[in-house]
Structure formats: C-alpha cells, structure tokens
Amino acid sequence: MKFRRSGRLVDLTNYLLTHPHELIPLTFFSERYESAKSSISEDLTIIKQTFEQQGIGTLLTVPGAAGGVKYIPKMKQAEAEEFVQTLGQSLANPERILPGGYVYLTDILGKPSVLSKVGKLFASVFAEREIDVVMTVATKGIPLAYAAASYLNVPVVIVRKDNKVTEGSTVSINYVSGSSNRIQTMSLAKRSMKTGSNVLIIDDFMKAGGTINGMINLLDEFNANVAGIGVLVEAEGVDERLVDEYMSLLTLSTINMKEKSIEIQNGNFLRFFKDNLLKNGETES
C-alpha cells in the first residue's frame, strides 16, 4: 500500500516500537510502503532523532546485504531515577510490612504502568548483553520477567518448585535457601531453552540470594550463561550474600516491626547506568 509520508512515519514508528531488538531489512519497509530505500532511510533518521530526544530509545543500523535497522528501547538516567524514587516512596508505606521482614509487593506487581517502566529499565541496562532468554522463579517474579522480555523481545522461562506433568521431562536441583538455610528443590523443563543461551535472571525480592543462586546452578545443567541479574528490591544487612553481581532498583534498609516503619533507599542501578555511559562514551541525560 502506498502511504503519504506522514502516514508512513506513523506506521513505521509503530512497527519499530512493537518489534524491539529485531533486525528488520530496509527492503521490508521499502516493499511495505512502496517507497525507495533512500526515502525509508530519511524517515528512520527522523525517528531515531526523536526517539533519542524523548528518551524512547535508539535505532541501530547494520550495514550490508544482511543488515537492516533495529529498535533498542532505552530509558534515560533521569527518568529512571525519578521513577525509582516514586516507587520507593510508595513501598515505604508502613501498611506494607509483613511478618518475617518482608514487604507487600503484590499490588505493585499488578500495575501495568509500573511493570512497563520496570521492564524497560531492566531492558535498557542489559540491552547490550545479547540476551536470549529471561528467567524467573514462580510466582512473584513472573510479571517482572515478562515486562523485561517484552522490551528485549525474547522468551521467558519459569523455574518451578514443583514438577508439572504438562512441562514434560525436567531438570531438578536442590538448593539452600539463603534466608532460612532450608534445602529446597527447583526444576525447569528440559526443552525450555537451548544449550549455551545467554540468560537474564529477574526476581522481585532478594534477601541472601539463595533462590537466585539456585537458578544460577540450574543454568549450569543447561550449559547456559548468566548474562545479568536484576531484582526489584534487595534486603540490606544480610550476613552472607550468595550472589555478587546483580542490579537492584531499591534497597530495603530497615523494617521496624515495633514502630511500624520502613526505610527504603535506591538500589545500585545507577552504577549500571554509569557503566553503560562510560562504555558507550555518552554523557548523562
């Protein structure tokens, strides 16, 4: 179908936004809009400039016969800081205190607007790690994993603590829960991922990191690689952390059960933003 340029720009933008991290040949757009590649290239230049100015992301152009254009979702550091600050204020409500030093997160994990921003933030930080799969453990981490995977355009695999007949043969391991020191079991369907996959692990809450450490050990059974670890909230003051390299959005500093108070601080996500800026030779925005 032949488009006017204004209509072509709208449709082209929408297509890119709904196909993140997908390399699309210019020939595809040229045939789709019945327009010359030179015209498509001009359109993409306009879209790239707008995406970068508005903090939507960027367009990566790959030259050559097998090349094309790829939309990479990005979140500006200033936007990430503002979002995490607002989220932290919401979680600092004393009514969220649960027995055992936990915080009620279910309502947060049910808000599409929050999940979308968390997913984009994770995807932005780990965009250059060539992620093949996002992994999480049932059940609270599932919405976060799908949110990140939607921006990375990769599948989600869910580790379970009980076997399900519908998943076929599984690989199971025993792991030690870091917070309770209890031996537990987790399993993953054998056909859930390819050997050698680069995996982004996502979870909602981390104390000592026993569950995440268990997922890392489970990945060894698939000869898969840990490409990154992202958690929504980590607990501070843990005697022994079983996971070293991870990104957290928020840190649960203290919970005073007697006085019904919570102290929430920013996690370490800013370090990852700054590392990416240094790696790419960019400046803060």
From Swiss-Prot:
Subunit (UniProt): Homodimer.
Binding site for 5-phospho-alpha-D-ribose 1-diphosphate: 138-140, 160, 203-205, 207-208, 211
NCBIfam families in the record: purR_Bsub (TIGR01743)
Activity modulation: The binding of PurR to DNA, and therefore the repressor activity, is influenced by interaction with the effector molecules 5-phosphoribosyl 1-pyrophosphate (PRPP) and (p)ppGpp. PRPP binds to PurR and reduces affinity of PurR for DNA, which inhibits the repressor activity and induces transcription of the target genes. On the contrary, (p)ppGpp enhances binding of PurR to DNA and repression of the transcription. PRPP and (p)ppGpp compete for PurR binding and allosteric control of transcription.
Residue ranges, annotated region (Effector binding domain): 74-285
Annotated region (DNA binding domain), positions in chain: 1-73
Residue positions binding guanosine 3',5'-bis(diphosphate): 102, 178-179, 207, 209-211
Family according to the record: Belongs to the purine/pyrimidine phosphoribosyltransferase family. PurR subfamily.
Consequence the record notes for mutating residue 203 to A: Reduces the affinity for binding to pur operon control site DNA and abolishes the capacity of PRPP to inhibit binding of PurR to DNA in vitro
SUPFAM superfamilies found in the cross-reference section: PRTase-like, Winged helix' DNA-binding domain
Keyword Repressor: yes
Stored CDD domains: PRTases_typeI
Cytoplasm is among the record's keywords: no
GO molecular function: DNA binding
Biological process terms in GO annotation: negative regulation of DNA-templated transcription; negative regulation of purine nucleobase metabolic process
Species name: Bacillus subtilis (strain 168)
Protein name: Purine biosynthesis transcriptional repressor PurR
Free-text function comment from the UniProt entry: DNA-binding transcriptional repressor that controls the expression of a number of genes involved in the synthesis, metabolism and transport of purines. In response to a signal of excess adenine, represses the transcription of the pur operon, which encodes enzymes of the purine biosynthetic pathway. It also represses the expression of the purA and purR genes. In addition, controls the expression of several other genes or operons, which encode enzymes or transporters playing a role in purine nucleotide metabolism.
Entry text on domains: Contains an N-terminal DNA-binding winged helix-turn-helix domain and a C-terminal regulatory domain (or effector binding domain) resembling phosphoribosyltransferase (PRT) domain. However, the PRT domain lacks enzymatic activity and serves a purely regulatory role by binding effector molecules. The ppGpp binding site partially overlaps the PRPP binding site. Binding of ppGpp significantly alters the electrostatics of the effector binding domain by creating a positively charged channel different from the apo protein.
Induction behaviour: Autoregulated.
Result for mutant: residue 204 to A: Reduces the affinity for binding to pur operon control site DNA and abolishes the capacity of PRPP to inhibit binding of PurR to DNA in vitro
Keywords tagged on the record: DNA-binding, Repressor, Transcription, Transcription regulation
